Amino acid sequence: TDYNIIIDVLPSVTINDLHEIAKRMVAAGFGKECSHVYSSLRREFLEESLSRLGLKKLSIEEVHKMPWQDLEDEIERWIKAANVSLRILFPSERRLCDRVFFGFSSASDLSFMEVCRGSTIQLLNFADAVAIGSRSPERLFKILDVFETLRDLMPEFESVFSDQYCVVLRNEAITIWKRLGEAIRGIFMELENLIRRDPAKAAVPGGGLHPIARYVMNYLRAACRSCQTLEQVFDENVVPSKGVSSSSSSSLSVQMDWIMELLESNLEAKSKIYKDSALSSVFMMNNGRYIV
């Protein structure tokens, strides 16, 4: 990754001139004023860069009211913007601050924080809005994408925001990342509730596969593609469900076993709808085979 992208755009003579101006203003006791003017200009550049990447300034309420399909598109744009910001834009701004305020580390740190704070808060607020939004099972996979993006960017948060002024931003990123983990666990709880609430209505003709069995098992199979991330999420909150032994199992496998146990209980209740005991047995056999 080219961390010098911004410095490369600016001629060396311009950076040297900015350094001379900063040095004179700090020496004259106008360090804060210099930092403020510099930060305002660079902040505008960052905001424009995020806008060009497609990131919109959305309130939490706007995110929550957005149709899911539109929010999926916003999440894709957010992932791109977050990666470019943390891996390219912010490190470049850090290097530029260090060049302009060379010899004045406190002014450099303060200026960098002021430059990046607004854009960082914009990125984190969107992730937070996703985390505290609806926990409908269909949202799992995109929320996993946001969780994984923040997780993978944690080393960048640690290195780029390492000074005293930026510790709040770093801690906020960790807090929101953990909140996304809570949201993912909440989605699995909602899946459990969905199974419990699925009513025993008309019997499936011929004792065939019930839609709830197909939905839940296809959902779990799709979720298992992100099993490493899900294991990390559930290991953060080890609370074995009642009736399931976890002595030699991961927290994720315990969760999966519990959901399948709920599904089997739900299907057993549905099998009692059949007046013909043979059809009831066929129903359990067909659905049991699909679950296995």
Regions found by a protein language model. Name each.
Residues 2-7, 36, 51-54, 61-64, ...:
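Long acidic/polar interaction regions in large eukaryotic complex-forming proteins
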Residues 6-57, 70, 138, 211, ...:
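Extended amphipathic alpha-helical scaffold segments
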Residues 63-292:
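Extended alpha-helical solenoid scaffold regions that build the rod-like backbones
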